């Protein structure tokens, strides 16, 4: 069924939607409420309807980033397709959907509240990035302190990775990278 992911930036709303679509083996459409209009919504719904004529598969997933930015008519355009199961809607928002999403659409969606990432989550993300990123895993990186890194990331995975990229990029050549509070705050 359709749902809305509500939480601060960088907590994984978009990533979760991709994981859901991939694990369910569903066709996946993405729209950004910032740059899409009613015409774009109708095109995706029409594609989903025509694809369903030729397959007996499950309904595709339509992910709408920043769904709170859609106006009433844009949200109205989704109603029929969500209600009849033509699409499964996954909306992502940083704003309270009770105030930003129209009641008829909200009543057809489960709302999941996501919280800012905790220090342990950020540490896991940092460890994984250092081990699996194609550039980082080939650099000599010594993580001495993480307080400033985690404080500046403020529970946001995207910020953490951006700060990490800036810090590592400040060390030119084959110089070993030292991540400590001073380096993070001076970059």
Give the positions of each predicted feature.
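Conserved AAA+ ATPase "SRH/arginine-finger" region at the nucleotide-binding site
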Residues: 32-34, 110-123
């Amino acid at each position: 069924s359709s749902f809305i992911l509500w939480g601060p930036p960088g907590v994984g709303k978009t990533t979760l939607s991709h994981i859901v679509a991939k694990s369910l083996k569903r066709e996946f459409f993405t729209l950004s409420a910032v740059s899409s209009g009613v015409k774009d919504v109708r095109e995706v719904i029409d594609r989903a309807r025509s694809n369903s004529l030729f397959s007996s598969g499950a309904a595709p997933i339509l992910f709408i980033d920043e769904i709170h930015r859609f106006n009433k008519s844009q949200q109205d355009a989704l109603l029929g397709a969500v209600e009849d199961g033509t699409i499964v809607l996954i909306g992502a928002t940083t704003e309270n959907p009770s105030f930003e999403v129209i009641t008829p659409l909200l009543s057809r969606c489960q709302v999941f509240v996501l919280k800012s990432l905790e220090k342990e989550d950020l540490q896991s993300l940092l460890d994984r990035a250092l081990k699996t990123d194609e550039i980082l895993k080939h650099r000599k990186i010594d993580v001495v302190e993480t307080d400033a890194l985690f404080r500046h990331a403020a529970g946001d995975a995207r910020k953490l990775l951006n700060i990490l990229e800036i810090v590592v990029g400040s060390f030119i050549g084959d110089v070993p990278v030292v991540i400590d509070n001073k380096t993070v705050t001076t970059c």
